[in-house]
Amino acid sequence: MLAVHFDKPGGPENLYVKEVAKPSPGEGEVLLKVAASALNRADLMQRQGQYDPPPGASNILGLEASGHVAELGPGCQGHWKIGDTAMALLPGGGQAQYVTVPEGLLMPIPEGLTLTQAAAIPEAWLTAFQLLHLVGNVQAGDYVLIHAGLSGVGTAAIQLTRMAGAIPLVTAGSQKKLQMAEKLGAAAGFNYKKEDFSEATLKFTKGAGVNLILDCIGGSYWEKNVNCLALDGRWVLYGLMGGGDINGPLFSKLLFKRGSLITSLLRSRDNKYKQMLVNAFTEQILPHFSTEGPQRLLPVLDRIYPVTEIQEAHKYMEANKNIGKIVLELPQ
């Protein structure tokens, strides 16, 4: 089968597509013939040598994919049959023509969505769902500040925040992105390149601050985050795009806010946790991708590349130009 590969860590120029052995499904696993796989920041970090796959995971890039069930391993429980369409949450391996998946990490394709659209859901939407509900304990009426609000996770988080009855606020780096955030349901957006998002957030909330922050930036934002955090607020850190170093009195500022700093990753969670998350998402959220009206959810796709243009896809994401997801299509 064909798969994305790199021989040494470095820039996008190291990526290429090569022939590798097709995997075989193990106990309780399904072999998925991949139609499409979306790009995530973790793919860029792994390519750079900064994010190793979890033990036992494929070293091929790709944390989410959609396609057709091609083979069932021993011990499968009969939830899937050969030929079914499905989308999958993966610890790696999605950017290849075939990938093995524990059957509990597969989800049905929502009615009305293409396989390419569906590939943009698993990692991004399950991450946003986990951050808001399982980690951040979002409540109706909460102000939620979403950094990188027009990323894949960000576009999902805006919509899920609205669904929870909370109020999404976003940061982004262009007017175009902020306009899209408003269309998705953001109550306000702040251009971090042109204004102090912390002061703008406090002004919008009439000095109260935000109850929940979803932060994939990290170090460079710490002081502004604490400044606009409400009393007893929750700050959920799930990425370090702005670095991991802190200089200054973070703990004292956080303490006087009675604030909570919580860290979270999804990729390294065990399969039992991921299956619980997939089940909850499938039951509570997935139907809303197919309903009509204001509660309908929408995976936001920016660009679609053939997998042979993997270098261009990485360059585009690294330039922070994307609004929503970048999806790779695999040859069928």
From Swiss-Prot:
- Superkingdom of origin: Eukaryota
Q: Name one GO cellular component term.
A: cytosol
Which reaction is catalysed here? 2 a quinone + NADPH + H(+) = 2 a 1,4-benzosemiquinone + NADP(+)
Q: Where does NADP(+) bind?
A: 41, 148-154, 173-177, 192, 264-266, 322
Catalytic activity, EC: 1.6.5.5
Gene Ontology MF annotations: NADPH binding; NADPH:quinone reductase activity; protein homodimerization activity; quinone binding
| Residues bearing the modification N-acetylmethionine | M1
| Keywords (A to Z) from UniProt | Acetylation, NADP, Oxidoreductase
What drives induction of this protein's expression? Isoform 1 and isoform 2 are both activated by p53/TP53, doxorubicin, etoposide and ionizing radiation. Isoform 2 is highly activated by UV radiation.
Q: Name one Pfam family in it.
A: ADH_zinc_N
Name the CDD domains on file. Answer: p53_inducible_oxidoreductase
Q: What is the effect of changing Y51F?
A: Increased enzyme activity
Spell out the InterPro entries in the cross-references: ADH-like_C, ADH-like_N, GroES-like_sf, NAD(P)-bd_dom_sf, PKS_ER, Quinone_OxRdtase_PIG3
Instruction: Offer one example of a GO biological process linked to this entry.
Output: NADP metabolic process
Is the keyword Oxidoreductase in the record? yes
Subunit comment for this entry?
Answer: Homodimer.
Instruction: Please give the function described in this protein's UniProt entry.
Output: Catalyzes the NADPH-dependent reduction of quinones. Exhibits a low enzymatic activity with beta-naphthoquinones, with a strong preference for the ortho-quinone isomer (1,2-beta-naphthoquinone) over the para isomer (1,4-beta-naphthoquinone). Also displays a low reductase activity for non-quinone compounds such as diamine and 2,6-dichloroindophenol (in vitro). Involved in the generation of reactive oxygen species (ROS).
Similarity comment: Belongs to the zinc-containing alcohol dehydrogenase family. Quinone oxidoreductase subfamily.
- This one is known as Quinone oxidoreductase PIG3
The gene for this chain is TP53I3
